[in-house]
C-alpha cells in the first residue's frame, strides 16, 4: 500500500481486522465464506451428499482465505488445509477459476452474489462461516467528508449483509 497517507488520499477501502492501527478505521462489511462451484463442475462429479465429499474435488486455494475454518465448522476438524491444486493470490482470480469450472472456491458471499443469483455458481451446502478479515474504510485523518462517505457506504454494505443473510448466511 505504500505511503498513501502522505498524498492527497482521503479514504482507502481495504481488508482490515478489528484492531486496525490508524486513527479512523471502520468495518464496512462482515462477510461470510462458503464453498461455491460452477454447476458444470458439480455435474462432472458424484453428487455432494456431505461436506466431506468436497475433499474429492479440486479445492481452489488462496492464502487470504484458508479452508480450515469452514472445514472445522462442517465437522471435518481432521481434514488438513488443502496443499495441492490451484493457488491464487487474488480473491477475484479464485472466483474466476471457480466460474471456469477449475475447482471449488471458498468465496465471500459479497463478491459472488451476482454469480449466485444468475446460477453461474452454486452453493452446495448452506453452511457459511464469518470471514476473518473484513472490508473496511481507513482514513489517516478523519474529516466530516470522510465520515459522511463512511456512513453512506455503511448503509449500502448493511443492505449487502442482509442479502447475504437471506442467501444462506
How should these model regions be labeled?
Residues 8, 77, 120-123, 139-140:
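Short low-complexity, flexible loop/linker segments enriched in glycine and/or proline
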Residues 79-124, 128-131:
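Hydrophobic hinge/microswitch elements
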Residues 4-6, 54, 96-101, 116, ...:
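Hydrophobic residues within well-ordered alpha-helices
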Residues 1-88:
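Acidic, Gly/Pro-rich loop/turn segments at junctions of secondary structure
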Residues 109-118, 127-169:
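C-terminal effector-binding regulatory domain of bacterial HTH transcription factors
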Residues 40, 69, 73, 96, ...:
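Residue-level signal for well-ordered alpha-helical scaffold segments within enzymatic catalytic domains
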Residues 64-68, 94, 146:
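A general structural signal for well-ordered alpha-helical segments in protein cores
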Amino acid at each position: 500500500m505504500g505511503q498513501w497517507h502522505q498524498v492527497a488520499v482521503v479514504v482507502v477501502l481495504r481488508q482490515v481486522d478489528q484492531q486496525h492501527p490508524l486513527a479512523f478505521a471502520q468495518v464496512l462489511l462482515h462477510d461470510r465464506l462458503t464453498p461455491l462451484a460452477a454447476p458444470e463442475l458439480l455435474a462432472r462429479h458424484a453428487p455432494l451428499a456431505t461436506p466431506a465429499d468436497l475433499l474429492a474435488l479440486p479445492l481452489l486455494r488462496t492464502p487470504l482465505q484458508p479452508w480450515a475454518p469452514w472445514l472445522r465448522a462442517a465437522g471435518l476438524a481432521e481434514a488438513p488445509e488443502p496443499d495441492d491444486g490451484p493457488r491464487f493470490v487474488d480473491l477475484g482470480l479464485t472466483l474466476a477459476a471457480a466460474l471456469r469450472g477449475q475447482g471449488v472456491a471458498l468465496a465471500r458471499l459479497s463478491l459472488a452474489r451476482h454469480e449466485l443469483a444468475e446460477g453461474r455458481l452454486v452453493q452446495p451446502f448452506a453452511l457459511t462461516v464469518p470471514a476473518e478479515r473484513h472490508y473496511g474504510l481507513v482514513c489517516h485523518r478523519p474529516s466530516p467528508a470522510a465520515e459522511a462517505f463512511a456512513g453512506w457506504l455503511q448503509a449500502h454494505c448493511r443492505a449487502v449483509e442482509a442479502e447475504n443473510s437471506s442467501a444462506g448466511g
